[in-house]
């Protein structure tokens, strides 16, 4: 009887041991996946920051002597506020350049409020995320910036563009630019109602003194 009890206890102990081993293995797998995903997220953020810096550097290279360039400009009009990634000002106008460093594939149409961003991680896992339609974002930026300038007595045409660093725009649109050459041509095309030197200096002062915030 004692032997049978001992065998039963040993079997029970082995079962508990195997369960503990299984739990430990599962925990290690979970931690490995979590670490990989966090590492993947950090890499994406790092890539986004590098892309932003690269864009700013490339934008400056297409500017002419009299062009003004500003980055990360905060603008407030009434209860509305926005931040502009890149802003170029010259006699031909005021140009907003919104940079999107989307990886993977983008799905959506012009009328959609949200687009679907889809990509695969290095481990083959599918990631899907809904992002705001940047066309709506840029239209809003155009409105806020033009009204903010008008509040300070400057009537000027503000034009916004979206640059996809990975060239993965879901469709063709006048708001999208695909190369710096295209942008250079746009910002240096003759305007029938150009900004005066006085207006350009006023705009420069408003931005540098943060009076648009």
Predicted regions and their residues:
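Surface-exposed interaction regions that form or flank ligand-binding interfaces
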Residues: 4-82, 88-95, 100-110, 114-213
